[in-house]
Amino acid sequence: MEIIDAKHAVSDMQENIERFRGTLDMEALTEEIADYENRMTEPDFWNDNEKAQKVIEENNVLKNRRDSFLNLTNQVEELELLIEMAVEDPEDEDTLGELEAGVAKAQKDIDAYNLEQLLTEPYDANNAILEIHPGSGGTESTDWGANLYRMYTRWAQQHDFQVETLDYHAGDEAGIDSATIKVTGHNAYGFLRSEKGVHRFVRISPFDSAGRRHTSFVSVDVMPELDDSIEVEVRDDDVKMDVFRSGGAGGQNVNKVSTGVRLTHEPTGIVVSSTVERTQYGNRDYAMRLLKSKLYQLELEKKEAERAALTGEKMENGWGSQIRSYVLHPYQMVKDHRTNYETNQPQAVLDGDLDPFINAYLQWQLSLKNPN
């Protein structure tokens, strides 16, 4: 990297940091963190374990916001020192290499911080629950479902999020009939809510002996994981429970007793299941949490549809409304039909490179709320 290029890059970073600083009341944030930490030192703090954990989680969110900003400022200050050293000795390859690597890392961190500023919905900070449901199309569709399962797992791992498989049903020949995963990490739902909808896949099918092109569809549902502080009324009479033998991905660790639980909410037809816990009671409890999350999400969607009807916005739902297409033949492209963002690197996307699509979606959502 040329020194002049590094100077321009650092100058742009400084402008971004000043913009971030203008939206962050550091003094108020520091006082809020101190208040939380004072509460954590009180003798009766652990009397209510659930409440104590919530205080700790909220404090960690604030500390993460503060530390992320301070980390950016420290990185840019270090880059300024490296530029001074490089100017004094332009032939020092070690300094130039450190400068180039530092600029790349700082830019990546600034992009990530900027992305977080777009997360403004009430439950964006929560963990995310993703349900993957292949459409009709046999083995090709179930294999596409497995590809999406892998894509989201890769994306989560790249962001140091934890992934837990809550429910997994393998396809007859390949892939999955359905899967539910939980992504645990700060802002997981805020990032992944962009993935809710129908994903279209076009390729020459490896399962077709004639080598023909196939189009497959998979529906992805995304909801925030809700805690008990969110009240969602569910009548016992409205819920039907079925039990089954649970097993892991690919048929691993199949239980000899029926510990898996499937709940059907009869008024809405919503079905959820859980196999993640070791006991039937544990799976019923977790499945009920999933059901409440889905009912809450359904209520939000109703309100959004009502709002859209009043403002004249067009709402698209169902299998006919693909949000994104992944084309491997006759050309290579991934395109989001909401934002029009596209790339000609489908394999990178399938390997978890979703951030550009997430960023474009969040920017698009912001433009809908603030047209001017």
UniProtKB/Swiss-Prot annotation:
Gene3D superfamilies noted in UniProt? 3.30.160.20, 3.30.70.1660, Release factor
Q: Which residues carry this modification: N5-methylglutamine?
A: 252
Q: Keyword set for this entry?
A: Cytoplasm, Methylation, Protein biosynthesis
This protein's source sits in the domain of life called Bacteria
Q: Name one GO cellular component term.
A: cytoplasm
Keyword Acetylation carried by entry: no
The UniProt similarity line reads: Belongs to the prokaryotic/mitochondrial release factor family.
What's its job? Peptide chain release factor 2 directs the termination of translation in response to the peptide chain termination codons UGA and UAA.
Know the name of this protein?
A: Peptide chain release factor 2
Q: What is the lineage of its organism?
A: Bacteria, Bacillati, Bacillota, Bacilli, Lactobacillales
Primary gene name: prfB
